[in-house]
Amino acid sequence: MEAVVLCGVQGSGKTTLYRDRFLETHVRVSMDLLRTRAREAALVRACLDTGQRFVVDNTNPTPAERRRYLEPARAARFRVIGYLVEIEAAEALARNAERPDRRRVPPAGLVGTARRLIRPTLEEGFDELWHATAARDGGWRVEPLLTTPPLPGL
């Protein structure tokens, strides 16, 4: 039983990481899809109750926001893995600008998320933490979070 919590600004590649690494094995929990916290909580609860692996694909910039997934997952004896999906600020803004209108975030919103983003820590309750960046070859560079310095911010 495993819960994966993705963290990162809009346009950093969280959904792409989900598709590339977890699509065939984990349910995707995303406010982009579910639209309300009640629906999101119901889906998380269903995953926990049935032992279904899941990935939370939201920005999750702060420990308080991550806690809503970590605490119930830990209580259900799930292994909790975090991924900080980072990207250069200019690249995040460029990717966001290329999104369809319904998925585009105002640049001020993206900058606001970047300013609120606090790197996750094991003390929050994660069993593992990984740092993911998109590689130039289209794949992913994934390494332990504790060994990677922060990328330049917004």
Describe the residue ranges of each PLM region.
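Conserved GTP-binding G-domain of TRAFAC-class P-loop NTPases and closely related GTPase folds
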Residues: 1-7, 12, 91-154
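Conserved nucleotide-sensing/catalytic segment adjacent to the nucleotide-binding pocket
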Residues: 23-84
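Walker A/P-loop
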Residues: 15
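Active-site signature of alpha/beta-hydrolase-fold catalytic machinery across serine-
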Residues: 20
